[in-house]
Design a protein with these regions (language model features):
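Surface-exposed loop/turn and intrinsically disordered segments
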Residues: 1-126, 130-140, 146-172
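A short, terminal or domain-edge coil/loop segment
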Residues: 125-126, 135, 213-221, 348
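Repeat-unit-sized solenoid/scaffold elements
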Residues: 27-29, 79-90, 127, 179-191, ...
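Polar/charged, compositionally biased leader and regulatory segments
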Residues: 24-28, 75, 156-256, 371-382
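A general structural signal for short secondary-structure boundary/capping elements
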Residues: 95, 146-147, 194-196, 359-363, ...
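Solvent-exposed, acidic/flexible segments
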Residues: 1, 42, 139, 211-212, ...
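Catalytic cores of peptidoglycan-degrading enzymes
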Residues: 235-382
Length: 382
């Protein structure tokens, strides 16, 4: 390459912004072209690149080729219009927002204390986003930490406060004494989760802290594998003929020999029925995970679309595979005691944007009508 010229063409006028001749004729060149002198304004323009090689063609002038590339200068952030009324959301629960954006975007959604939950574009061009209210956040903090955001194809970002009506919810708290027999039973059962830890107490604490945190991150990644449409309808169904043994966000403190050594939150419902009871899909959807996952043991996760998923763990067996489309009530597994569980039961959970929220809301047809489907229907009305 002997020479390169770059110009901006707009309204049939060419403004040359870069021109350089090279002493060495290399087959490939990388150049930086400053745009400061281009005098560009918002809108479309053509970037014209002319390159001349070092051959003797044209009486020694070389061969020249010109390429034009259609470009567009965009420095304006996208505009978001929220179509749903401000949601009412309780601590540990979930909410929905429908919105439109005035241009194509690379991503959009809701930020909850900096955690991004994507919205999904619908056939009518609007976006729907289910987003969580983390169980650890006070209402006054949560309502000031929810934002709606969008990034256009040029990288311009808009971000604004999303009005939410946040309410507190209380959760149960327990203090449990860890016995040596219990710690030994955990180590004997789950040593493979902490192979480098020899002490039974340290083994339990490693599983309760490190493995639990790693499992939560895995669930967030699983939560990204979702359909852009609602795959479910109606209230979710709980395990038939079951009794609740533990609730969502139960705060457990663990003592050993009278000293506090750890804590955890129980992020789901523990439901006990008969031994090896059939586990039905709580609603229609697509299976996105099956297999063993740390404290959850044998686990099935079903995607219901728009980042909403149901979770079934401690299973004795699994009767579906990833990719299966399941219907509400279809048997997907049997209850068991795999993972960090003692006694046959089902741990049932709900994920929104990869974050576990209380299943109670999704089991309630009135809550779904008032807070999800009714709001979406109203926002879509002409």
């Amino acid at each position: 390459i002997r020479a390169v010229t770059v110009g901006v063409r707009k309204n049939n006028t060419l403004n040359t912004i870069f021109s350089k001749h090279f002493e060495k004729y290399l087959p490939e060149r990388t150049v930086e072209v400053p745009l400061a002198g281009a005098n560009l304004h918002e809108g479309a323009f053509d970037l014209e690149i002319r390159a001349t090689d070092g051959s003797l063609a044209g009486f020694g002038q070389g061969n020249t080729r010109t390429v034009q590339m259609a470009m567009r200068l965009d420095t304006q952030p996208p505009r978001i219009s929220v179509k749903t009324l401000p949601p009412n959301v309780r601590r540990g629960g979930a909410a929905v927002v429908r919105y439109t954006v005035d241009e194509d975007v690379s991503d959009s959604g809701v930020l909850v204390a900096g955690y991004f939950v994507p919205g999904y574009q619908q056939k009518d061009g609007s976006y729907i986003c289910f987003f969580p209210y983390p169980y650890t956040m006070p209402a006054r903090e949560y309502k000031n930490s929810v934002e709606i955001t969008a990034t256009d194809l040029a990288g311009n970002v808009t971000k604004s406060r999303l009005t939410v009506m946040a309410y507190e919810r209380t959760f149960k708290s327990d203090s449990l004494e860890l016995s040596d027999n219990f710690l030994m039973s955990v180590q004997n059962k789950l040593q493979h989760l902490a192979p480098q830890v020899a002490n039974p107490l340290d083994c339990y604490l490693y599983i309760n802290n490190n493995v639990r945190a790693a499992n939560a991150q895995t669930l967030r990644e699983i939560g990204k594998n979702t359909a852009a449409a609602m795959l479910w309808s109606g209230a979710f169904a709980r395990l038939p003929r079951s009794a609740a043994r533990a609730g969502f966000a139960d705060h457990r403190f663990y003592n050993y020999q009278g000293k506090l050594v750890g804590e955890s939150y129980h992020l789901g419902f523990d439901l006990a029925s008969v031994r090896n009871a059939e586990v039905p899909a709580a609603n229609s959807g697509r299976v996105v995970f099956t297999g063993e996952l740390g404290i959850y043991g044998n686990l099935v996760v079903i995607d219901h679309g728009l980042g909403l998923m149901s979770l079934y763990s401690h299973l004795s067996d699994i009767q579906v595979k990833v990719g299966d489309v399941v219907q509400k009530g279809q048997t997907i597994a049997h209850t068991g005691s795999t993972g960090l569980a003692f006694g046959d039961h089902l741990h049932f959970g709900i994920l929104v944007g990869g974050v576990e929220v209380t299943p109670l809301e999704w089991l309630d047809p009135k809550w779904i009508r008032d807070n999800i489907t009714g709001r979406l229907d109203a926002s879509n009305a002409p």
